[in-house]
Every structure is written in structure tokens, then in C-alpha cells.
């Protein structure tokens, strides 16, 4: 069984220094790797209260679930947009051999270290306001995608003005010490930026924005909206209190989604709608509906579900549009093909064209390769 020290020893020295900085370990940097492993491992083992206070809320709540399950007991979880820090540094175990889900567990030695302290760490995060500050920060990043450091600090000061749960000095320290600044900042053309952890190539957002000259400013959102958008990491959702959002929740619930599965599908629609010009992303926006197509009785009901998803997606803030929605900017809209598309019209006029797609049982996948059942694809055209 690998110990904490064994795991740390697998990293390069430069990586260990990144871990040291993130965990806030006051250990010497300019030492041999062997000594750095010993000192960093000793810090993790002997000072859990100190380094737990440096963790993101998402990591602490995952740790709490793993502690509740017990040492070496795996939990089956979905794949989020980005891994937890503790998975990245391999302090908790994970098995990603199954493409549909991953198993995560806490090793016995880490369990012994954190179990007596994890509840207090979460309690402190809530009572100090640190979690809410983090949610506001994540919310602004989820809404805008990429911000200059100056824009980010200005927005966070808006949040502080609305809450004032800490002194300005304490609040400023919380921002400067934020794990997000350590994890999600980068330099580009002489400017310092911070980006959503859900984005893998933040530079592509900056370059993509140049294609939308009509968007000349950032849309403003209230601090409450930012906290809403940053709650529930890593599955962020937004706009569920709008008429389009309420329609979406009702429709997905009717299709059988509930609890974590419902939140995950709501989140996926927002994330995939960001890049709706990409064919793969456009299809993925509607995955929650197409996955349940066998439970939908008629094409009219199926089409209504798709319309609800598209209507909701077009109200959401987009990274490329600096927080504006597709409806507001009048671009990057999710648009469904009309029922009477060109191919359908041609087949209705000349049924022989339909022979190019062999008939299939109504609930079988359509032979055309669309991924839809035959009755919702070429079957509806031929009937």
C-alpha cells in the first residue's frame, strides 16, 4: 500500500514545490527532493487543520463523503469537468478505467490524518464566510469564463460591498490566498488573467471573443447571481428561476431525472451551450433528452422537449459573449432544424428516396446513424 510519502515521491521536484505552495506548507524549497518529500509529507501528516483550511469547498466536501464511507471504501461518482485537487495530487485513490463513472476512495493513512478534523474544517469554512466568497468567485468565473485579474478583483469588491461579512483587509487576504488564484491564473500578451476551472484552453476564449465585435462590454450580474452560479462545484447551474429554467426543470423531472443526476444534466446544458457552433457540443446540449427518447411517446412530445432545452440554452451567459446570452447578443444561438427540413420534404414528394435508409423497428436506432430511434428519425418521415 502506498503511503503519503510514497505518493509524493512519484512527483518531480518542481511539482512538489507546486503542491507545497498550494497546501501552504512552510517548508524549505531549496533542498534535495528526498528532503522535500519528507518535510512536505510530515506537514500533511502533522498539520491537517492548517492545510485543510487551504482547500476548496469541493475538495473538503468530497473528503467528508469519503471519511463517512470509511477507509479504502470506494464511492462511484460521475466525471466532472475538472478533477478535485486531491485526486490530481493522488492523495485520494481513484479508478478511471470505466468511461461512464469513476471510483474514488480515501487511503487508510490519509483517513487517520483527516477524519478527526474534516467536520471542523467545513464548519469553519461556512462560519467564516470563506465558502461563500469562493462561491462568488467561482460564479463570476462560470459566468464570464475568463477575466483579467483587475476585472476579477473589481467584481469581487462588488460582492464585498453587498455582504461586508469580513473587514476589507480580511476579505482582501482571502482573495489573495484563494486556491483559485493558484490554480487558475495565466499570462497572455502581457496581461494576467484568471479563468474558470471548467475551461481547458482559456486562451481560446480570448481569441474567440475577437469574432464578436458587437459585444463591447461585460454584462453585469449581481453578487447574488454570482453566488448562485458558483454554488455546487463542480456542477454549476444558472437561471433556473427564469421561466425557461423552470420549464427545463419540469421537463427533465418528467423524464425521470432527479437529485444529483438532474443537477448534472442542467450543468451539462450550460457548459455545452458555450460552444454551440461545434457540432459535437450542439448534439451534447440535447443529450438529456435523446438519452430518454425511448420513454417519450410521440415525436411532438420529443420536439417540445428539444425546444425547451434550446430556449433555456439561449438565455444563459456565454464566455465568448462576455456574459451576454445568445438571445441578447443575437449570435451563437442554439437553433433546432425545422420539422419540414429539405430532406424530409424531398422524401415526402418522392418516397423512393426513403429507401436509401432501410426500415427498422420503431425503437431501434435509425440506420442513418443519427443516434435517434427510427420512429423519431427517418421512421417519422416515412409514416
Report each predicted region and the residues it spans.
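Acidic/negatively charged segments and metal-coordination signatures
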Residues: 1-41, 45-46, 54-383
